[in-house]
Amino acid sequence: MQFLVLALASLAAAAPSIKLRAPSDVCPALDTPLCCQADVLGVLDLTCEAPSDDTSVSNFEAACATTGLTARCCTLPLLGEALLCTTP
């Protein structure tokens, strides 16, 4: 019971940090464009941040490259990490 309460409290605390974005033409469907540092088998991407320009695929990739990160389209971004990512 205590674990359940702790788990729900942590989810409630993390919810405001999830940033909802308007869909862009860079990534398909509900994927979110992110610039990520490390990719673990396409399942987990680490150290991700929102790109400064995601108006087109070339601008998205260039914006990520200027910071030394890789352009990725991720299904579930959460607290600087992301799940199920693909290349744009």
Curated annotation (Swiss-Prot):
**Which cysteines are cross-linked by disulfides?**
C27-C73, C35-C64, C36-C48, C74-C85
Oligomeric state and interaction partners are given as:
Homotetramer. Further self-assembles to form highly ordered films at water-air interfaces through intermolecular interactions.
Protein name as it appears in the record? Class II hydrophobin 5
Q: Which InterPro entries match?
A: Cerato-ulmin_hydrophobin (IPR010636), Hydrophobin_sf (IPR036686)
Protein keywords: Cell wall, Disulfide bond, Secreted, Signal
Give its localization: Secreted, Cell wall; Secreted
Protein purpose: Aerial growth, conidiation, and dispersal of filamentous fungi in the environment rely upon a capability of their secreting small amphipathic proteins called hydrophobins (HPBs) with low sequence identity. Class I can self-assemble into an outermost layer of rodlet bundles on aerial cell surfaces, conferring cellular hydrophobicity that supports fungal growth, development and dispersal; whereas Class II form highly ordered films at water-air interfaces through intermolecular interactions but contribute nothing to the rodlet structure.
